[in-house]
From Swiss-Prot:
Keywords for the protein's UniProt record, in alphabetical order: Cytoplasm, Cytoskeleton, Microtubule, Repeat, WD repeat
Tissue specificity as recorded in UniProt: Expressed at low levels in siliques, flowers, leaves, stems and roots.
Record note on disruption phenotype: Hyper-induction of abscisic acid (ABA)-inducible transcription factors (e.g. ABI5 and MYC2) and their downstream genes in response to ABA. Increased sensitivity to ABA and salt stress leading to reduced root length and increased dehydration tolerance.
Renumbered ranges of motif DWD box: 114-130
Regions of compositional bias (Polar residues) in chain numbering: 365-379, 509-526, 703-739, 754-791, 822-841, 850-859
Protein name per the record: Katanin p80 WD40 repeat-containing subunit B1 homolog KTN80.2
InterPro entries: G-protein_beta_WD-40_rep, Katanin_C-terminal, KTNB1, WD40/YVTN_repeat-like_dom_sf, WD40_repeat_CS, WD40_repeat_dom_sf, WD40_rpt
Composition bias, Basic and acidic residues: 530-553, 569-585, 998-1008
Stored HAMAP family: Katanin_p80_B1
Subunit (UniProt): Component of KTN80-KTN1 complexes composed of a hexamer of KTN1-KTN80 heterodimers that sense microtubule (MT) geometry to confer precise MT severing. Interacts directly with AAA1/KTN1. Interacts with subunits of the CUL4-based E3 ligase complex DDB1A and DDB1B.
Length: 1181
């Protein structure tokens, strides 16, 4: 037997190391090499001496290429210079300069007028040979470019880089079309299919991947080999791909992805591959020598001698069946030319869309005659059969060609399955017989058939193993002939065939162009084939119309259908809409008739048990909560059409009462507030931790009218009765032992306040620790009842400034203590509030209220009551946001009776801020809380009143102060105010830290209820987060629109109008690494954006702005200063005038920045360091 691969010759090519090599594709007899000796040598295969040595480079040659006519030679050097030679005239034609680093890849355009070059500077350049210059530069790779290929029609250029990415560029539009990112190593080789719109890529990650260039999908991948891929080349017939590895040669078919053969070659660094006259030529290099390697394709599967002999045998057998086979072929021939780029409609080249019995012609030729078609099928060894044969079955083991691997999928990344290769059903009788023989051979294994199956299996083994025809017995040929004759006879359909849908299974591809959508692939396990028969009956993804009959006028028999289903078992591709049914039949060995339910969640079809999306987890969490609600005992359900108004009183236990929660309210100028006749009970122990101030922001023009009910608390051993009556007054408290002054807080929010409401009630129930929430007010009220311990009513004091009027009609609040009585009757004008405290206390749970001004809330008849259930133990009080609008009228009618046991904790003070002309309605929700003995700190969410929007407030986004001196003036007061507020925010962190430390000392109760709180918070803000991210994405797309048109000035102008600090920071962060594209004009446009970012609430935009300003001032600072300070020149100079205006604009912005920098310095950290650095740069003359 002749050698399958051998070395033809080896010789010294250069006086220094060889760096690159390329074979001419026209004659496949010439090749060129480039080395460190600055030369490009031209060679003829078989001759040890060079035909020509091309000089001219002054640095090492890193890349070489032939044009399609083998007349021009292109070479790129390590200096970035590209030189073009004419081989026929032996002279240099052009020299191109433009790359900043070594030119690592060059390639000629198919039509010869252009060329492409890639460099280690990550830029891809297109050059015009006639104009001697660069006409386009593509930037997108993050590392150097290693290989370049033009599409056969010259419309696109594809580049592979060291960043593991393959990018497709449109030369006509001058932009990036798509990028493939599934490789895990540098790209080393690219090749296009000669007949299909298909791209193959070889990488150092030891895999070859096949990409559909119509839909930009990954359609197949080889399994990782032992070594990396160096060079790949499609066979001219398009059936197979020859893959040159570091030390061997592999032959793959791409549909399906099957490794047919492997040859150990022994070459070193493979430079290029070429196929000519049935021979595979490979040129490799090592140091300064070059080796030429030859492999006889006729000795390699699937082009081996055995395949040709079997072809002759099959032609004899099928000569009598040509007419029948031809009649059954109804489909059009497969497209054998490059697709038309002008058509906008994407045609799927892998789906046979014809009616009737589908049949697809082979890629290697046309379907001129049935004999030719079947001959090709025999020569190709029917790739469908290869994928059908299970590797664990007897057929695969007995075959001498058992080294073949049927690769249906592989993993490119953890957890990601590739789509299986696509299968084309060949309609010839020969292929049907082979499928039947596969099924028969498999049934023999189960003991369902007899001697006839043995003969058929032996015939199939003979074909697969590549034995010569004389090795096969006449009985084998007779058995195959008998099989064809039986197939031609009309047969009555079986019962199973009648009940089944009778259309051959067809491979379907998802229309989506995104690879990462849901796709499920079947495996090739032989053990699962028997279950497919049962699963196929109920499978809905087959899309088989009933009543389909073949050309003989009868339905196909059950055996034919079963064989077809088995043949398509391992290759069928499911679209996302049908994935659930297929997975059900695959995962259940018994062939369950029920398909998995596919439910739609927010417009996305989700397969239960497979997809773990965030939305599904939220939905599942809600279901669990509702299921637990059935076990709850105390629930309060109100009808959506009626609102009950009745006082609610919690059980009063004579233990110890927790102090009321104080919520200070600050009223600025011209505040008209009717009510605050507020009886306040404030009892604290002597040693207390500082209270935490939680802000409440109310917008302008808020009408405020409160009628606060009395609060009664009973404690053993200590009694205090306080009666407060205020008319523009503060509150004072007397006690016997030790008093500590509290902030000015004359407004009280009681947790048992009853309000009229059009909204339905919301009931929340816990087993053993119940909290019934009843909303019976115009906004909503909360009733939370728990066992043994109750949290006190929140008290919301108000600081009254100029022109503030408060009238109160509330009865006094009486608190009785047996041993230490203290009665106080106060009437004061803006007097301080005094509170009594007790030692070691933990903050009490707070029910926040969210107030909105200009939106009316009315849920009386539209929203049903909501009942939610929680686990047994809770560590914090449930936070219930309540929405208030301006038009709401509130009446407080519910008293509060609350009791608390042993250990008490002080209430957190929640300051409320009212701006000018605020009239605020009462919004106290009725709350009755009963808690168990040990209480942990409660989560607190503050209250916010917005002017025009109904937004859930977060503590981090609420501004509770307006602190800046009115005497301070600045060119940008808005930014200055923001910076001032943020600086003051930083100073309050030290005060809050003590609260946090005290909070940590308290016992923390953790359990499933904490997770429940987290889920509720996430669910509450989920849609808002999605809307925010969608808004940012839209804004970024606007900027990208200008960016893709290379309109940087337009992108910056759009960025100024967006006024979104997050988007601005993202774009400027990118510009920070591309300062070379910025000019003085762009700096003047960008400076206002940078100034605005300095007023951001978060650190990242400020850091990005400071970093960008440092770089820009370092580049343009001197120019701006010299231009602004220069004397005016007599005469007219338009360019000088324009430059002066730009510099004056930049100087004005830098002065604004310089005034803000001292405030940023106070914030400390990285911001302070950069601010000081920028301040020094700006102050330098």
């Amino acid at each position: 037997m002749a050698k399958r691969g051998y070395k033809l010759q080896e010789f010294l090519a250069h006086s220094a190391n060889v760096n690159c090599l390329s074979i001419g594709k026209k004659t496949s007899r010439l090749f060129i090499t480039g080395g460190d000796d600055y030369k490009v040598n031209l060679w003829a295969i078989g001759k040890p001496t060079s035909l020509m040595s091309l000089c001219g480079h002054t640095s090492a040659v890193d890349s070489v290429a032939f044009d399609s006519a083998e007349v021009l030679v292109l070479a790129g050097a390590s200096s970035g210079v590209i030189k073009l030679w004419d081989v026929e005239e032996a002279k240099m034609v052009r020299a191109f300069t433009g790359h900043r680093s070594n030119c690592s890849a060059v390639e000629f355009h198919p039509f010869g007028e252009f060329l492409a070059s890639g460099s280690s500077d990550a830029n891809l350049k297109i050059w015009d040979i006639r104009k001697k210059g660069c006409i386009q530069t593509y930037k997108g790779h993050s590392r150097g470019i290693s290989t370049i290929r033009f599409t056969p029609d010259g419309r696109w250029v594809v580049s592979g880089g060291l960043d593991n990415v393959v990018k497709v560029w449109d030369l006509t539009a001058g932009k990036l079309l798509h990028e493939f990112k599934f490789h895990e190593g540098p790209i080393r080789s690219l090749d296009f299919h000669p007949l299909e719109f298909l791209l193959a890529t070889g990488s150092a990650d030891r895999t070859v991947k096949f990409w559909d260039l119509e839909t930009f999908e990954l359609i197949g991948s080889t399994r990782p080999e032992a070594t990396g891929v160096r060079s790949i080349k499609f066979h001219p017939d398009g059936r197979t791909l020859f893959c040159g590895l570091d030390d061997s040669l592999k032959v793959y078919s791409w549909e399906p992805v099957v490794c047919h053969d492997g040859v150990d070659m022994g070459w070193s660094t493979l430079g290029d591959l070429c196929i000519s006259e049935g021979k595979l030529l490979g040129c490799s290099y090592y140091q300064n020598s070059v080796g030429i390697w030859v492999s006889d394709i006729s000795q390699i599967e699937p082009y081996g001698i055995g395949s040709a002999d079997k072809k002759e045998c099959v032609e004899k057998i099928l000569s009598a069946l040509d007419d029948q086979s031809f009649d059954r072929i109804k489909s059009t021939p497969r497209r054998s030319s490059s697709p038309d780029y002008e058509t906008k409609e994407i045609k799927n080249i892998y789906i046979d869309s014809t009616g009737g019995n589908s049949a697809v012609a082979h890629k290697s030729g046309s379907l001129s005659t049935p004999a030719t078609s079947t001959g090709q099928a025999g020569d190709n060894k029917s790739l469908v059969v290869h994928s059908v044969v299970p590797r664990d079955s007897d057929i695969g083991k007995d075959s001498s060609d058992s080294g073949k691997e049927s690769i249906t999928f592989s993993k490119t990344k953890p957890g990601m399955l590739l789509r299986p290769a696509y299968v084309r059903k060949t309609p010839t009788k020969f292929d049907e017989t082979k499928k039947q023989s596969v099924a028969v051979g498999y049934l023999k294994k189960s003991g369902l058939d007899g001697e006839k199956k043995l003969d058929t299996e032996t015939a199939f083994d003979s074909e697969m193993s590549g034995r010569n025809p004389y090795d096969a017995d006449d009985s084998i040929i007779k058995s195959i002939t008998n099989k064809f004759e039986q197939a031609l006879l009309p047969e009555s359909p079986t019962d199973e065939a009648k009940c089944m849908l009778l259309k051959p299974p067809r491979v379907q591809r998802s229309p989506s162009t995104k690879y990462n959508e849901a796709r499920w692939a079947t495996s090739t396990d032989s053990g699962a084939l028997d279950s497919k028969k049962n699963g196929l009956e109920s499978s809905r993804d087959m899309d088989l119309p009933t009543g389909l009959r073949d050309d003989r006028g009868s339905n196909p028999c059950e055996e034919d259908i079963e064989n077809k289903s088995i043949s398509s078992r391992s290759e069928r591709v499911l679209s996302p809409e049908k994935a659930g049914d297929e997975l059900k039949s695959l995962e259940s060995p018994g062939g369950s008739k029920e398909s998995k339910s596919v439910k739609v969640v927010r417009g996305v079809k989700v397969v239960s048990g497979r997809t773990r999306s965030l939305v599904e987890r939220f939905e599942r969490g809600e279901k669990i909560t509702h299921s637990e609600d059935k076990a709850a005992s105390a629930t309060v359900v109100h009808s959506s059409n009626s609102v009950e108004e009745e006082p609610l009183t919690a059980s009063v236990q004579t233990v110890s009462m927790m102090p009321t929660q104080v919520m200070p309210v600050k009223l600025d100028q011209a505040t008209n507030s009717t009510t605050v006749d507020v009886p306040v009970l404030s009892t604290r122990r002597t040693k207390s931790t500082p209270v935490r101030v939680m802000p409440v922001v109310l917008g302008r023009d808020t009408s405020m009218a409160t009628d606060t009910p009395p609060v009664t608390s009973t404690r053993p051993d200590r009694t205090s009765a306080t009666n407060l009556t205020s008319d523009v007054s503060g509150v004072t408290s007397k006690r016997q032992t030790r008093t500590s002054p509290a902030p000015v807080m004359p407004m009280i929010l009681n947790q048992t306040t009853k309000m009229k409401s059009d909204e339905p009630s919301i009931t929340s129930t816990w087993p053993d620790r119940t909290s019934a929430t009843d909303l019976t007010s115009d906004v909503s009220g909360v009733i939370s009842s728990r066992q043994t311990r109750t949290s006190p009513a929140p008290v919301m004091p108000m600081k009254l400034n100029q022109k503030t009027k408060i009238k109160s009609d509330e009865p006094p609040i009486t608190s009785t203590r047996p041993d230490r009585p203290s009665a106080t009757n106060l009437t004061s004008d803006e007097s301080p509030v005094t509170s009594t405290r007790q030692a070691k206390t933990s903050p009490a749970p707070v029910t926040p209220v969210i107030l909105n001004q200009r939106q009316t809330t009315n849920m009386k008849s539209d929203e049903p009551p909501v009942i939610s259930t929680r686990p047994l133990r809770t560590s914090s009080a449930r936070v219930m946001p309540v929405i208030l609008n301006q038009a709401s009228t509130t009446y407080d009618e519910r008293p509060l009776s609350s009791s608390r046991s042993a250990r008490t904790s002080p209430a957190r003070i929640m300051p409320m801020k009212l701006n000018q002309a605020d009239n605020m309605p009462s919004y106290e929700p009725p709350v009755a809380l009963t808690r168990s003995a040990r209480n942990s700190p409660a989560r607190v969410i503050p209250v916010k009143l917005n002017q025009a929007t109904n937004v859930t407030a977060d503590a981090s986004h609420i501004r509770s102060r307006q602190r800046f001196s009115p005497t301070q003036t600045l060119a940008t007061p808005a930014v200055f105010d923001q910076v001032t507020d943020m600086t003051l925010d930083e100073t309050t962190k030290t005060q809050q830290s003590s609260d946090i430390l005290t909070q940590k000392e308290e016992p923390q109760i953790s359990g499933r209820e904490d997770d429940g709180d987290i889920w509720e918070i996430l669910m509450r803000t989920h849609s808002e987060v999605l809307n925010t991210l969608q808004s940012r994405l839209t804004k970024l797309q606007i900027v990208r629109h200008f960016w893709e048109r290379s309109d940087i000035k337009g992108a910056i102008a759009a960025l100024r109008k967006l006024s979104d600090h997050s988007v601005q920071a993202d774009v400027i962060n990118i510009l920070t690494d591309k300062t070379e594209i910025l000019t003085l004009d762009l700096f003047s446009q960008l400076a206002p954006v940078l100034t605005g970012l300095l007023g951001s609430k978060t650190e990242r935009p400020v850091n990005v702005s400071l970093e960008m300003l440092l770089k820009l001032v370092a580049v343009f600072g001197t120019v701006i200063q010299s231009t602004v300070s220069a004397r005016r020149v007599v005469g007219v100079d338009l360019h000088a005038e324009e430059r002066l205006q730009i510099c004056q604009s930049c100087s004005a912005e830098l002065q604004k920045v310089q005034k803000i920098l001292p405030l940023l310095t106070r914030r400390g950290g990285l911001i302070a360091r950069k601010a000081q650095e920028l301040n020094l740069v700006l102050q330098t003359p």
